[in-house]
Structures are given as structure tokens and as C-alpha cells.
């Protein structure tokens, strides 16, 4: 899956489950852009897992600063699941 496809999937998750209507800037703070508090972060994690059919590990969210960080995390999990 390409970065563009992952970014589009994230945009859909944000739109459907976090009521976010804007574009996702790869270099922007994902916490600020999506206005993530602990409950919204949990929603994002669960819906990303469901959408991409991956399993994120406890603590994965701690390495998320930008949207690109989340894209890279999803890509790693997809690659791990493919092995």
C-alpha cells in the first residue's frame, strides 16, 4: 500500500469517526490537527486498526507526532502482517 493510499484511508477514518473535514498535512501535528484528547486518540487507534486490518501495540501512539509518523507506523504494521 502506498503512502498516498494510507493517507487517503486516514482521511476517511478522520472524516467518518472524528468528524474532521479538512486535508491531512503530512508534516502537521496529528494531535493538533485532529484535536486529539485521550478519548479521540483511542477512537483513532481503534478505527485505524479496523480500517487497515492491523494491530497497533500499546505505546505505538507515543511515537506519533506528525501525520507522516502515523502513515509510517501503519506501513510498518502492514509490512509485518504481510510477513
Predicted segments with their positions:
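Phosphopantetheine-dependent thiolation modules in NRPS/PKS and related acyl-activating systems
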Residues: 2-36, 40-45, 50-83
Amino acid at each position: 500500500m502506498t503512502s498516498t493510499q494510507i493517507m487517503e484511508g486516514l482521511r476517511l477514518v478522520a472524516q467518518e469517526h472524528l468528524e474532521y473535514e479538512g486535508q491531512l498535512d503530512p508534516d502537521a501535528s496529528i494531535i493538533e490537527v485532529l484535536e486529539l484528547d485521550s478519548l479521540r486518540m483511542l477512537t483513532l487507534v481503534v478505527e485505524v486498526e479496523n480500517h487497515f486490518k492491523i494491530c497497533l501495540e500499546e505505546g505505538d501512539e507515543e511515537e506519533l507526532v506528525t501525520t507522516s509518523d502515523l502513515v509510517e507506523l501503519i506501513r510498518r504494521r502492514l509490512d509485518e502482517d504481510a510477513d
